[in-house]
């Protein structure tokens, strides 16, 4: 069984929601990233998303974009990132890891070479953040390579909800899929709107084998409680943890993660 499936089943069987947090590799440097990963795991993170920096992470927040730039200034050689992921896997052979990046990184590194790097690091899943937006060519070439390597490609449902993605999610999504939470017209998320429940139910009604993870705007325990109330299987936290990494507030990082994880436990 894929480590992601095994971990999600274990968490859901306890009646909890699983928690995924984004680890920006290379921010502030690769050595420190490994120490931050230890904080993640000790504080209750169930699944770690290892983020490879992109020049244009346009689906993400300004703090995440700035984190990507700090990573690239610290280390621009992607081979070093893959070497670090191999070291991480050696340190944590049983932990589920998903690697996220954008198509510019994959294209520049080379699609086949990129998947080989994931395979050599024994990664469980990969999220191509802009897969459905601007990179169908990359998806076309990458999917069979990922399947051959036994690596899940994580699906992403953006807001506004896109009906045409449901068929792919129903038939091909594995592990988990990410649902971008509802925002207002200015893109703000002052809370986790109850309307997210409808979209979660729509995805679940497809019969997909992927667990549903809600993301964007979950930045503290109160928001996590709101997320629990709309009944996803799990949630992902990015900006809030990256802001604490940027300020080197590692105690606050651990407290944040523990608080959010506690909010997922009945």
Where are the regions that the model predicts?
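Catalytic cores of alpha/beta
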Residues: 30-41, 112-113, 160-172, 218-235
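N-terminal small/glycine-rich loop or linker at the start of catalytic domains
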Residues: 6-28, 61-62, 67, 88-100, ...
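Short, electropositive alpha-helical surface patch
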Residues: 101-122, 228-239
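Hydrophobic faces of well-ordered beta-strands that scaffold small-molecule active sites
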Residues: 19-23, 48-50, 97-101, 126-128, ...
